[in-house]
Swiss-Prot record:
Gene: proB
Protein source organism: Bacillus cereus (strain ATCC 10987 / NRS 248)
PANTHER family xref list: GLUTAMATE 5-KINASE, ISOPENTENYL PHOSPHATE KINASE
Chief location of this protein within or outside the cell: cytoplasm
Name recorded for this polypeptide: Glutamate 5-kinase
Positions bound to substrate: S49, D136, N148
NCBIfam families referenced in this protein's UniProt entry, alphabetically: proB
Catalytic activity entry: L-glutamate + ATP = L-glutamyl 5-phosphate + ADP
Amino acid sequence: MKKQRIVVKIGSSSLADSHGGISKEQLSDHVAALARLKEEGHEVLLITSGAVAAGFSALGYPSRPVTIKGKQAAAAVGQSLLMQAYTEEFRKYGIVTAQLLLTRSDFSRKEQYSNAYATLGELLNRSALPIINENDSISLEELTFGDNDMLSALVSGLVSADMLMIFTDVNGLYDKNPQKNEDAKKYYFLPEVTEEIASLAGDAGSKLGTGGMKSKIDAAKTALSLGVSVFIGTGRGQEKFVDVLKGKGDGTYVGNAPQKEIKMNKQWIALHSVVSGQIEIDAGAATAIIQHGKSLLPAGVTNVSGFFKVGDVVEVMTQQGRVIGKGQCTYSAEELREIKGMQSQHIQARGERHNYEVIHRDHWVSL
């Protein structure tokens, strides 16, 4: 089997025991299956939930806390317990683990984003297994936004993974809720995530997790857009992840032939950057960018809105107000207002700092 880079996401419901805590049996089962992937020569990254589940009982909560401060306190205690449990299990297979705790803001800051990319790359080069969780004790997003589903999609894109496996307590996607409808039809393969498929998923999560099927479908759509194929399902035993790669997984495969992967810098611009202003361009410039893949030149700029610095990300819109993309600007807003609409030779004649492009095509993404 060809060596692949695999991101596996394990949710709280796939780790929990009957009391809502972490099941050692479940965790051991997952680790054994992850070790088999490594044994087959694949590179593996693990996105794991479960910090709250691992920590709430140690703080005296009778069940998973419902308040934000309770969840974050439980996560602060549980993260070290969860990591300790993983480390001890992986040690049995001679696998070195590494912990990364991320927040959504780490993705929006380009320097942190680049550092995460470099760190993960070095860990994989050293045959370590990165274990990634959202920093639950200080981050609100993981506790209210998808049980790490979207984090797993973003990480899979960041590392140019071949496949994202989202493991949960439901064996795939259905056209109806299978727990309430006996005639529910299971989707074994979906070439893409359509609006119809997205509308079928409810928001409700399981009792022990925060991510329902909707968050998993959203994550699958994001991963597919980044060139990563997806599996959503369940399974038990040492071969369950290897079986997914063989097409025998108990769930739904999403995505047809792999799409072209998106470079790290363009991923950051498309998904994580903060827009600092807007640039309006004429029809000729819009055609050159969209249809011919050209860079944006000062001559095509008709208006500048906002206050931004060199290197900030701006939206680009047509004169009819339609946003067509965004990119990193090589001029500040003040500089661009001075030279908008001017030909390159006229800018040079002014004797001012001159870049041929306002936005280079390597730092541009279409929307």
